[in-house]
C-alpha cells in the first residue's frame, strides 16, 4: 500500500496554482479514538515543501 501512495500523483493547490505531484514522504496520522488520515509531503517546483492530507482511513 505504501508504494501505491508514493507512486501516484496527487493534485496540490498552493498559492492559487495547481500542481500534479508525487509525494516525497507519507505517513498515517491517527489521534486516539478518531479515524486516521494519510499525510504526505510534496516538493513544489519552486523548492517549497507543502503538507497535505491525501486519504482518509476507515474507522
Curated annotation (Swiss-Prot):
PTM note: Methylated at multiple sites, to varying extents.
Superkingdom assignment: Archaea
GO MF, one annotated term: double-stranded DNA binding
Location relative to the cell: Chromosome; Cytoplasm
Keyword Ribosomal protein: no
GO cellular component term of the entry, any: chromosome
Assembly information from the UniProt record: Monomer.
Main function: A chromatin protein, binds double-stranded DNA without sequence specificity. Constrains negative DNA supercoils.
Name assigned to this protein: Chromatin protein Cren7
Native source species: Pyrobaculum neutrophilum (strain DSM 2338 / JCM 9278 / NBRC 100436 / V24Sta)
Amino acid at each position: 500500500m505504501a508504494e501505491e501512495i508514493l507512486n501516484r500523483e496527487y493534485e496540490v493547490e498552493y498559492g492559487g496554482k495547481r500542481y500534479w505531484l508525487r509525494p516525497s514522504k507519507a505517513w498515517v496520522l491517527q489521534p486516539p479514538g478518531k479515524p486516521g488520515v494519510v499525510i504526505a509531503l510534496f516538493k513544489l517546483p519552486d523548492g517549497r515543501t507543502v503538507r497535505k492530507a491525501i486519504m482518509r482511513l476507515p474507522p
